[in-house]
């Protein structure tokens, strides 16, 4: 999970949880080994983009094939336009023709689910080439421990009762938690106060007032 966006995503700061097999494959790819095709899927916040960025090979959209390049990555393929789908189709075929090159794609759904979403079938059939991994989210206890550790590393102290209140009043996905902690850290520092439930409620009210003034 990518908890603090200011950090460069790496394999060392990825919280593995139950995704050890997928992380092992990404590690192999960084070393120039591993499967030619890798498909990572899962809900938002499970770490797909983190792993792609850890490869250091992410491009905007669909990258063109380059004889001097060995790893290609395409993030969030569910958002591709019809033109980009054609580009990815060509990339799949070209990579397959060049042993020693690798392609990693990520999505928010399984390859089979794409078949019911109107994507071109000759592309979605290629999503199952190579290995397919569903990334699993962290358990609530794992999330809690990582949030506390990450907050501690930035000097942000969050009491257990405050964390309980946050978990009961905000979505528990890690993107939300990460952004929330960053915002609360900045607000608490500017107010020169500790992060407490009253401070969080005050912060929420101010944000609501700001939205209404727009």
Roles of regions detected by a PLM:
Residues 1-23:
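Dynamic helix-loop-helix/coil hinge segments at AAA+ ATPase domain boundaries and subdomain interfaces
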Residues 34-51:
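Walker A/P-loop nucleotide-binding motif
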Residues 63-94, 102-110:
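Conserved P-loop NTPase "ATPase switch" module shared by AAA+ and STAND
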Residues 111-128:
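Short regulatory helix/loop adjacent to the ATP-binding pocket of P-loop NTPases
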Residues 113-115, 130-142:
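Conserved AAA+ ATPase "SRH/arginine-finger" region at the nucleotide-binding site
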Residues 157-170:
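Short conserved motifs of the RecA-like P-loop NTPase core
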Residues 170-184:
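The conserved phosphate-sensing helix
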Residues 188-207:
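Conserved C-terminal helix/linker of AAA+ ATPases
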């Amino acid at each position: 999970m990518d908890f603090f966006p200011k950090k460069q995503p790496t394999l060392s700061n990825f919280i593995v949880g139950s995704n050890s097999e997928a992380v092992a494959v990404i590690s192999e790819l960084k070393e120039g080994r591993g499967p030619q095709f890798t498909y990572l899927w899962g809900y938002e916040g499970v770490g797909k983009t983190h792993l792609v960025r850890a490869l250091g090979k992410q491009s905007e959209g669909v990258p063109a094939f380059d004889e001097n390049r060995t790893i290609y990555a395409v993030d969030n393929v569910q958002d591709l336009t019809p033109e980009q789908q054609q580009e990815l189709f060509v990339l799949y075929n070209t990579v397959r023709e060049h042993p020693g090159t690798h392609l990693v794609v990520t999505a928010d759904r399984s390859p089979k689910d794409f078949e019911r979403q109107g994507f071109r079938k000759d592309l979605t059939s290629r999503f199952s080439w190579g290995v397919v991994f569903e990334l699993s989210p962290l358990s609530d206890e794992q999330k809690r421990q990582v949030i506390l550790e990450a907050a501690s590393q930035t000097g942000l102290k969050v009491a257990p009762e405050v964390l309980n209140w946050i978990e009961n009043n905000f979505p528990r996905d890690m993107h939300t938690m990460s952004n929330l902690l960053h915002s609360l850290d900045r607000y608490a520092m500017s107010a020169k106060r500790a992060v407490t439930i009253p401070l969080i409620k005050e912060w929420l009210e101010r944000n609501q007032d700001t939205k209404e003034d727009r």
